[in-house]
Amino acid sequence: MSEELSKKHTTRLNKLQKRLRREVGSAIADYNMIEDGDKIMCCLSGGKDSYAMLDILMNLQQRAPIQFEIIAVNLDQKQPGFPEHVLPAYLDKLNVPYHILEKDTYSIVKDKIPEGKTTCSLCSRLRRGTLYGFAQRIGATKIALGHHRDDIIETLFLNMFFGGKMKAMPPKLLSDDGANVVIRPLAYCREKDLEEYANLREFPIIPCNLCGSQENLKRAAVKDMLNQWDRQYPGRIETIFTAMQNTAPSQGVDREQFDFVSLTRDPNAPMRGDVAEANLPAFDFLDIANSGRIDLDAAKRIDIVNTYEV
């Protein structure tokens, strides 16, 4: 690499790192993801997102005004061709505490799922159960996952289109049994930024399709739709995510989120709007010769606008 290219590479890396660090810091602060004394179990898959999450969290750990531990954990699910040496070698260089767990969920999935069907759903459930249990064993107070903003938005549309639910991935989640708190520090980060960051940092990426499973076709379709929107209407994806943070249950139709049944009017409420302005001059009289402006002198008070007889 030439000196000029190396300089551009470093400049771009620094700029991108600052942006990602700022976005992760904002997400942590907004949702109180990490507190003083926390023991964070950082789940590492070998993909670009989890590498970036660990890298940024370790960076923030050095600058944060609070103290917290980071423990990296990878689950080796015994997929064919999984390079077992890659993650230990990388983590040894970082000098970060880590655990490599081994559980043959691959065989379970292949036994339960017919050939040619997507295995991701069952595989992720088995992985989640193992990681949740291990977090309790080591006394982790938070489990950090590498889902980013695109994952969250895609999940919203997947649940809308195929599940009939307005449901996404929350940046912070309490497990159903109440035993674990899951955090997603990359909730504000764009996937394309994480991909570029991983390339610039030259993380030793492990392919996610070693099991031979095809990508979830429904998720792929939603991703294509969102990418097309992003190209045609710049800023739309940001607006969608902002909308997800500004919900108004009283303006929706979900009876579980708002008590529509008990709504009653207040007969003693002060008059407002059109009722309060009933004694003002009528504004139906426009002076066309004066650029359509209201001619208050020609306006008359209206006692009765229309009378209807039934």
UniProtKB/Swiss-Prot annotation:
Similarity annotation: Belongs to the TtcA family.
HAMAP family: TtcA
Keyword 4Fe-4S: yes
Function description: Catalyzes the ATP-dependent 2-thiolation of cytidine in position 32 of tRNA, to form 2-thiocytidine (s(2)C32). The sulfur atoms are provided by the cysteine/cysteine desulfurase (IscS) system.
Gene name linked to the record: ttcA
Annotated metabolic or biological route of this protein: tRNA modification
GO MF annotation, one: magnesium ion binding
Record's protein name: tRNA-cytidine(32) 2-sulfurtransferase
